[in-house]
């Protein structure tokens, strides 16, 4: 899935065509956060893009930053041939249930949060998890998300629940280091990158205007990860 987010429909189309040309199967598009402030504008944004491309499109609902893709708008958009998925970043259960009731039989819906994934699979019937950092919960040879997903799909809910509970310390660190900053209005890219490096994945340097972590904060994050006992810290 290629992220093709842009304020300009022409740029989205260009990005989508490039993604398709290099082998991507789907793209995901965030609703514009500048000009699109009502349902009709959002609909026309996606309608125009879909008329110009031939690749599957996933809607991305982030009501904290953009005009919400509510159940009625999602129903309209689901009729466009390209629209095949919906990524839900609204934390409201009522909103998620409304989306599932509206379009759950037409397109695939994902709640963009790992914490309720086991419940989403087993109770809501959701088929996929689209999230930006489940990789922070795994390392080489240890894939707990895959393991508890496989266990649930194989009908072993006891084992799935056991594995899912085992990574609760990481969820708590995620709430502190990632969502804590995110919910306060700052993108926690530096923290994501350093977390990756500590568990053996190259994160690289941040680019302006993202501010790097201080050495003090790095030591604190490293100490927090060590205390979980779940990783061999690099």
Regions found by a protein language model. Give the residues of each.
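Helix-coil boundary/capping segments in enzymes
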Residues: 1-16, 27, 106-113, 173-174, ...
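Active-site beta->alpha loop and helix N-cap motifs at the rims of alpha/beta catalytic domains
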Residues: 1-66, 211, 231
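Electropositive phosphate-/nucleotide-binding environments in soluble metabolic enzymes
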Residues: 9, 13, 138-142, 154-161, ...
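Glycine-centered loop/turn motif at secondary-structure junctions
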Residues: 23, 81, 124-125, 200, ...
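Catalytic alpha/beta core domains of metabolic enzymes, predominantly
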Residues: 48-51, 63-176
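Conserved short secondary-structure transition element at the edge of the structured enzyme core
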Residues: 168-208
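Long, low-complexity C-terminal extensions of enzymes
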Residues: 208-234
């Amino acid at each position: 899935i290629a992220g093709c987010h842009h304020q300009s429909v022409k740029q989205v189309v260009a990005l989508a065509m490039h993604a398709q040309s290099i082998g991507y199967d789907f793209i995901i598009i965030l609703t514009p956060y500048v000009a699109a402030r009502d349902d009709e504008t959002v609909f026309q944004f996606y309608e125009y893009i879909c008329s110009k491309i031939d690749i599957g499109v996933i809607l991305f609902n982030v009501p904290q930053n953009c005009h919400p893709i509510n159940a009625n708008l999602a129903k309209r958009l689901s009729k466009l041939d390209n629209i095949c998925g919906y990524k839900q970043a609204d934390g409201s259960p009522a909103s998620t249930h409304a989306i599932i009731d509206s379009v759950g039989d037409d397109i695939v819906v994902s709640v963009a949060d790992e914490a309720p994934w086991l419940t989403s699979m087993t109770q809501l019937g959701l088929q996929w998890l689209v999230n930006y950092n489940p990789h922070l919960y795994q390392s080489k040879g240890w894939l707990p998300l895959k393991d508890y997903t496989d266990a649930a799909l194989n009908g072993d809910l006891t084992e799935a629940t056991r594995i899912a509970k085992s990574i609760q310390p990481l969820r708590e660190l995620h709430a502190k280091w990632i969502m804590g900053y995110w919910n306060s209005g700052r993108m926690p890219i530096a923290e994501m990158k350093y977390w990756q490096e500590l568990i053996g994945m190259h994160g690289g340097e941040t680019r302006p205007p993202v501010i790097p972590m201080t050495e003090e904060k790095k030591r604190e994050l490293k100490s927090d990860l060590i205390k979980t006992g779940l990783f061999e810290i690099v």
